[in-house]
């Protein structure tokens, strides 16, 4: 999917159900609230909901989420 930003095209990336499950599992393993998890990732709670539930996000959000998942492993 595409999103326009100041006339520029941005390709959105899909958080798959498997990735969303991994995000939820890490949140649970660390005993974090959604607010705490979103703060650790560096995103808003609304954006975190998209990650947790699976959905399309901007590349920078995807990158932050994948970096967060890879931490501690």
Descriptions of predicted regions:
Residues 1:
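General nucleic-acid-binding
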Residues 4-29:
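A short, Lys/Arg-rich alpha-helix, primarily the initiator
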Residues 6, 70-73:
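Short C-terminal boundary/hinge segments that cap the last helix of small helical domains
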Residues 23, 34, 62:
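Helix-turn-helix DNA-binding elements, focusing on the entry/boundary residues of the two helices
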Residues 29-32, 57:
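Alpha-helical structural elements of signaling/regulatory helical domains
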Residues 31-49:
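Short alpha-helical DNA-recognition segment
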Residues 54-67:
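Short, basic-rich loop-to-helix N-cap that marks the start of a DNA-contacting helix
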């Amino acid at each position: 999917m595409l999103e326009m930003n100041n006339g520029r095209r941005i390709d959105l990336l899909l958080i798959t159900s498997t990735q969303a499950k991994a995000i939820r599992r890490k949140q649970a393993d660390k005993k974090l609230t959604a607010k705490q998890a979103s703060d650790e990732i560096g995103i808003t709670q609304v954006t975190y909901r998209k990650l947790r539930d699976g959905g399309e996000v901007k590349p920078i959000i995807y990158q932050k989420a994948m970096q967060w998942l890879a931490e501690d492993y």
